[in-house]
Amino acid sequence: MLRYLTAGESHGPALITIVEGLPAGLAVEAGYVDRQLARRQGGYGRGKRMAIEQDRVRILSGVRGGLTLGSPVCLQIENRDWENWSTTMAPGPEADTGDRVVTRPRPGHADLAGVLKYGHKDVRNVLERASARETAARVAAGSLARRLLEELGVEILGLVVRIGPVQARIPEVPLDALRARIAESRVMCPDPYAGLSMVEEIDRARDDGDSLGGVFELHAFGVPPGLGSYVQWDRRLDGRLAGALMSIQAVKGVEIGLGFEGAAQRGSEVQDEIFHNGEKGFYRTSNRAGGIEGGVSNGQPVVVRVAMKPIPTLRRPLASVDLVSLTPSEAAFERSDICAVPAACVIGEAVLAFELARACLEKFGGDSMTELLDNHRRYLERIRANRAGG
């Protein structure tokens, strides 16, 4: 089974990712992962931390000569900011645990719940791990999954459709043109007019000492029918995707296809009618289901929208209580972003890629890429024969 674990604190020496279950023979290079990490660091509205970090991955195991070995792959991303925190965050007894103590939990963060759960006195012991800095490790893991999906003909595309009150209109243009517009935008928005308004809204939030959330949309093209299953609740593809995406820091909602919009419509307006001809086989003229029916991919693009709440760390702090004195106080302030929706979109791409890669490996199997690709090819041949009425 494909899985990963991450480790590391926000201001610790490094982030570590261990990916287990990749087949042998997958072409992997550090530069590919680095490009995804650089995308995560971009986007208008990021904080000063991104000016310090220049995320680069170091492959420590599981790859030789540019090809995976089938053994666990260990990835390391150094934290350049560690040199400014080495005394505070040292793992040994030399750590100055009285330095940079945080006792005023921030509303909306894991701060208070974390100290209550684990019995910490210093909120720093919570926020260092709960920080979205951890998502750099997830993007590294997702990059390997993305490489595997590319070999299977699956492409992932993410775009921002909303920041704060500004809603984008997605242009009906060819995929290459859409991809180019996203790349040109400072907020990953293919609507240039909405993109400018989003930047202005971020500037206003910065001036007000506030933050902004938004919505991003993920598309997976080339997903074969048959991923996931309806036979048990925990094997349904839509449930697995939603659960994985909801685990991203600050994400508060996930919808697939029409999502909540479909709840206000009649059944005849929501379902995707089925057609057939000798050339196409089975086909649809709409994709309101977002590529998943009954917990199983149906061969259409998988479409998911993800809602991210505004970042809780505010330059004009909200009310809190000091954990030591139990007196009213302003919440602590830690260096943070104004808006991280574009970065979250890149993280969402990685998370989606990993879950789809996991589903592909479960469906097709194979300890090597040769075996996986052969199984995948034979399955698609059978599907095409069925579509043609064979």
Swiss-Prot record:
EC top class, as a word: lyase
GO terms assigned for molecular function: chorismate synthase activity; FMN binding
Biological process, per Gene Ontology: amino acid biosynthetic process; aromatic amino acid family biosynthetic process; chorismate biosynthetic process
Cofactor: FMNH2
Domain of life according to the entry: Bacteria
EC number of this enzyme: 4.2.3.5
UniProt KW keywords: Amino-acid biosynthesis, Aromatic amino acid biosynthesis, FAD, Flavoprotein, FMN, Lyase, NADP
Binding positions for NADP(+) per the UniProt entry: 40, 46
UniProt binding sites for FMN: 129-131, 249-250, 294, 309-313, 335
Keyword NADP on entry: yes
Catalytically driven reaction(s): 5-O-(1-carboxyvinyl)-3-phosphoshikimate = chorismate + phosphate
Metabolic or biological pathway, per its Swiss-Prot or TrEMBL entry: Metabolic intermediate biosynthesis; chorismate biosynthesis; chorismate from D-erythrose 4-phosphate and phosphoenolpyruvate: step 7/7
Cofactor note (record): Reduced FMN (FMNH(2)).
GO cellular component term, pick one: cytosol
Pfam families: Chorismate_synt
Keyword flag Lyase: yes
HAMAP family: Chorismate_synth
Quaternary state and interactors: Homotetramer.
Function: This reaction introduces a second double bond into the aromatic ring system.
UniProt name for this protein: Chorismate synthase
